[in-house]
Amino acid sequence: MKVSLPAFEKARVLVVGDVMLDRYWVGPTGRISPEAPVPVVKINQVEDRPGGAANVALNIATLGGQVQLAGLVGQDDTAHALTLGVQTLGVEPQWLTIADKPTITKLRVLSRNQQLIRLDFEEAFDKADSVRLLKQSEALLDSVDVVVLSDYAKGAIDQPRDFIALARAKGVMVLVDPKGSDFGRYQGASLITPNMSEFEAVVGTVTSEADLLEKARGLLKQHHFDAILVTRSEKGMTLVTANAPELHIPTVAREVYDVTGAGDTVISALATSLAAGADLPQACAIANTAAGVVVGKLGTSTVSRIELIEALALHHGESGFGVVSEDQLAYALEQAKLRGERVVMTNGCFDILHAGHVSYLKQAKALGDRLIVAVNDDASVKRLKGDGRPVNQVDRRMAVLAGLASVDWVVPFSEDTPQRIITRLLPNLLVKGGDYKLEDIAGGAEVIAAGGQVQVLGFEDGISTTAIIQNIMANQ
């Protein structure tokens, strides 16, 4: 499967669920306590990280999505620390404060990268608190495309059926990270993401691949889910939908260091991808890759777009390349330059790709390590070439270009010239075909001012899109 990142900045997501603070006390240990047979840890580092549903929201924000976070907190210093933690990364908290309950806190003591003990500070929230939270969250549905219910069985999400039904009626997808043995609580959800233990707690022991699929499809029918994504640790993920063959995605983790928050990463990457316009198989592949990154980190962690681009390139070869948005390309270009790669850029309409184009692009690629092709969108081609053009729509033109071995990235632009996009990207070498003077090439002055170069390459004589069109018309 070819995997490319959607424009995450377009994603609008609401996360509702059990928010908590993950607190870490870290230090060396060199002796056993005289009071009891336990190690003595000399704490020299204290760190607070948003956890649970808050970690889901942070993952979405780190990927570039717009996210609101609804949850239950106490009237305490921990709630203040949690608020600061999420606001720092642009998450908009929508707390419901319960004065007589503490904000959930999980304190972990670590030494030499090993967790020695975990201490939980929490009290169960009342069912009435959950009802109030979900009712408060209904007002946010009109401003989002996807809702994530992040359930840690702490009381924030007790009976969400009515909330799910309302969201679906408004055209909002609902993704659920489930907890407990009653998946019927989430009836009507678009997608649920149980891990294997959670799945077997509901359906019983899975004895084979066929058994897994049969039981998953049974849940789809019973609870009116659109899809189930079962996360299976070292076996990857299995996506089961009602009307399509199952999809198995193998794990991409290189080294498992800490699985804390891996489920949060999966559902956050799914939500961000789907809200940004990715289809479900693509979103699952992106989520699988994100999970492979996060398990290589210590503690509750997030995955950035840069890390995801690098991981996709590593595990999928062409992933992270091909047809990309301008923002995706800016990130990829930054990483290419950090790796010391020489980036070449050219542009054009490329309406009917012909041998002259192929030869020209091959020459351009030979001048560096990576080649960007910026393509005029349909409206700008029509303005430049007149009625009847383009012959091929921009998505088809870009797909053909992306299939060439010489081309690494293809990006559209809407202006009559590529001046703006070239000025933003600033390649090492800007190439143009034809008989242009260097000073007349759009973006050339800016590239040179930034330390880059501009070069003109020749086209093959007698081959042009216009000539091809005229020949076709003459032979009709």
From Swiss-Prot:
**Where is region (Cytidylyltransferase) located?**
345-476
Q: Name one GO molecular function term.
A: heptose-1-phosphate adenylyltransferase activity
What InterPro entries does its record include?
Bifunc_HldE, Carboh/pur_kinase_PfkB_CS, Cyt_trans-like, PfkB_dom, RfaE_dom_I, RfaE_dom_II, Ribokinase-like, Rossmann-like_a/b/a_fold
According to its UniProt record, in which pathway does this protein act? Answer: Nucleotide-sugar biosynthesis; ADP-L-glycero-beta-D-manno-heptose biosynthesis; ADP-L-glycero-beta-D-manno-heptose from D-glycero-beta-D-manno-heptose 7-phosphate: step 1/4; Nucleotide-sugar biosynthesis; ADP-L-glycero-beta-D-manno-heptose biosynthesis; ADP-L-glycero-beta-D-manno-heptose from D-glycero-beta-D-manno-heptose 7-phosphate: step 3/4
The residues responsible for catalysis, as annotated, are: 264
Matching Pfam families: CTP_transf_like, PfkB
Tell me which EC number(s) this protein carries: 2.7.1.167, 2.7.7.70
Which catalysed reactions does the entry list for this protein?
A: D-glycero-beta-D-manno-heptose 7-phosphate + ATP = D-glycero-beta-D-manno-heptose 1,7-bisphosphate + ADP + H(+); D-glycero-beta-D-manno-heptose 1-phosphate + ATP + H(+) = ADP-D-glycero-beta-D-manno-heptose + diphosphate
Enzyme group, top EC level? transferase
Keywords in alphabetical order:
ATP-binding, Carbohydrate metabolism, Kinase, Multifunctional enzyme, Nucleotide-binding, Nucleotidyltransferase, Transferase
GO cellular component terms given for this protein: cytosol
User: Which BP terms from GO are recorded?
Assistant: ADP-L-glycero-beta-D-manno-heptose biosynthetic process
User: Which Gene3D superfamilies does this UniProt record tie to the protein?
Assistant: 3.40.1190.20, HUPs (3.40.50.620)
Q: Does Ligase show up as a keyword for this record? A: no
Region ranges (Ribokinase): 1-319
Q: Residues that bind ATP, according to the entry?
A: 195-198
Q: Which HAMAP family match?
A: HldE
Complex and partners: Homodimer.
Job description of the protein: Catalyzes the ADP transfer from ATP to D-glycero-beta-D-manno-heptose 1-phosphate, yielding ADP-D-glycero-beta-D-manno-heptose.
Entry's family note: In the N-terminal section; belongs to the carbohydrate kinase PfkB family.
Q: What name does the UniProt record give this protein?
A: Bifunctional protein HldE
Organism name: Shewanella baltica (strain OS195)
Whichever gene encodes this chain, its name is hldE
